[in-house]
Amino acid sequence: MSKQVRVRFAPSPTGPLHIGGVRTALFNYLFAKKHNGVFYLRIEDTDQTRFVPGAEAYIMEALEWLGISPEETVGKNEKFGPYRQSDRKDLYQKYADQLINSGWAYYAFDTPEALDAHRKQHEAEGKTFIYNHHNREKLDTSLVISAEETAKRIANGEHYVIRFKTPVDETLHLKDIIRGDVKFETNLLDDKVLFKSDGMPTYHLANIVDDHLMETSHVIRGEEWLPSMPLHVLLYRAFGWDAPEFAHLPLILKPVGNGKLSKRDGDKLGFPVFPLEWKTEEGVSSGYREKGFFPEAVVNFLALLGWNDGTDKELFSLEELVEAFDLNRVHKAGAKFDPEKNKWFNHQYLIKQNDADLAKSFSTILEEKGFSTPLEVTTRIVSLIKERAHFVSEFWDLTDFFFQAPSSYDEKASKNWKEETPALMKELISVLENIEDFTSANIETIVKEWLTKNEIGMGKVMQPFRLSLVGALKGPHLFDIVEIIGKEETVSRIQKAISAL
């Protein structure tokens, strides 16, 4: 590319970062890295009424956990700082004034009550009220009152806004990297508010000014911002600046039904839609981190929501995603969020983890349950069951019988306990007690030799044997269980089963 790629993620700190925002950040990160560019984070907090304490720190922590931290942001490499819009508010006034002076904007003094009256009047006539060329010169604006009167009203502290003066009778033919050619009629656009009398710009003005001053080369954002594209392109024209290239990402859709995946869907349907847990007075919304997802799995899953590399490949490291990523392969249509596929990705990353690392995580769970087990034993157990798990948190239900004897026996499996079973189990105890090399392979060899020699069917012993140790017909290789729990515990559990069943 001819100029340096500089892309940004620019969230508003109005609450926890939704998974759709995370994907936007990820695609910006991948694009920047692919083109040896810069990915930066700008905090867009111009609407102070919606500001939520803790949200900014949450956004930064989430990106760090996911491994996609920005190179420039608040307090870090602020080359074009400040990177928080509320800290930049003094500079926006001059750009608003510039638009006034060049005829691209005007002052509007309409009160909320007056605007409401206009809306109601239009509704009564079966029309929709749009603040634009149709009525801007019939309203209380600097387009119809003198410059002296305008200055006097501002000096007297009267509330006003500065609105963009949208051109009339123009068809805008714009280019979007993902959607191709898009067309907008300026007569259908409203004159958006750019600046308020409290000295704060709206999103539209601050966004364009900052993208220009921070040398943003590409704006990669969600599809919900596509209707704002004509205004933003016109603002670049009004300032005489080159516009960046635009790419509008497809929506992430609900797993069932229609519409965009919302912040409420996760709690309602039982899966996380936030990278990290978010606590409020109303309750706790679950996060991927706290649910036991690996950040690499979340990144891999999100990358494939609306993009693929043109092959059937599904598992990508972050480095492989950077190498393969291409905005031209991002889909236009929305991508359905599949919670089961989400878990599948986590399973794929779990089974690739080092057994000892997983054992350390599992040891924390064991300690909470009152079990202190040598790490090498826990590591061996993990190696036997991790293929069956999506999360480390599932390990306990897959392994509880390694740590404690069953307190009950599966009713259906207990039907395998026949009249002759107790006698066979007592014989098995004798066989086990005489084994000196109590290792899985050796135990298996000796037990099977005993079965063959005495012409005893495998099912007559193996199923009751497993039921005695586990309490159900589940679990990894039976003789691995026997070795790990040891001879004494194995014999004790068989004796207990004989008494109970």
UniProtKB/Swiss-Prot annotation:
Where is the short sequence motif 'KMSKS' region located? 260-264
Kindly give the Pfam families that the UniProt entry links to this protein. Answer: Anticodon_2 (PF19269), tRNA-synt_1c (PF00749)
List GO terms (cellular component aspect).
cytosol
Location comes to: Cytoplasm
Coordinates of motif 'HIGH' region in the sequence?
A: 11-21
Q: Which BP terms from GO are recorded? A: glutamyl-tRNA aminoacylation
* E.C. code: 6.1.1.17
Q: Which UniProt keywords apply?
A: Aminoacyl-tRNA synthetase, ATP-binding, Cytoplasm, Ligase, Nucleotide-binding, Protein biosynthesis
Q: Which InterPro entries match?
A: aa-tRNA-synth_I_cd-bd (IPR045462), aa-tRNA-synth_I_codon-bd_sub2 (IPR020751), aa-tRNA-synth_I_CS (IPR001412), aa_tRNA-synth_I_cd-bd_sf (IPR008925), Glu-tRNA-ligase_bac/mito (IPR004527), Glu/Gln-tRNA-synth (IPR000924), Glu/Gln-tRNA-synth_Ib_cat-dom (IPR020058), GluQ/Sye (IPR049940)
List the catalysed reactions.
Answer: tRNA(Glu) + L-glutamate + ATP = L-glutamyl-tRNA(Glu) + AMP + diphosphate
Describe the family membership recorded for this protein in Swiss-Prot or TrEMBL: Belongs to the class-I aminoacyl-tRNA synthetase family. Glutamate--tRNA ligase type 1 subfamily.
Which HAMAP family has this protein been placed in?
Glu_tRNA_synth_type1
Q: Sorted alphabetically, which PANTHER family does this protein's record hold?
A: GLUTAMATE--TRNA LIGASE, GLUTAMATE--TRNA LIGASE, MITOCHONDRIAL-RELATED
Q: What does this protein do?
A: Catalyzes the attachment of glutamate to tRNA(Glu) in a two-step reaction: glutamate is first activated by ATP to form Glu-AMP and then transferred to the acceptor end of tRNA(Glu).
Q: What is this protein called?
A: Glutamate--tRNA ligase
Record organism: Flavobacterium johnsoniae (strain ATCC 17061 / DSM 2064 / JCM 8514 / BCRC 14874 / CCUG 350202 / NBRC 14942 / NCIMB 11054 / UW101) (Cytophaga johnsonae)
Please name the taxonomic classification of the source: Bacteria, Pseudomonadati, Bacteroidota, Flavobacteriia, Flavobacteriales
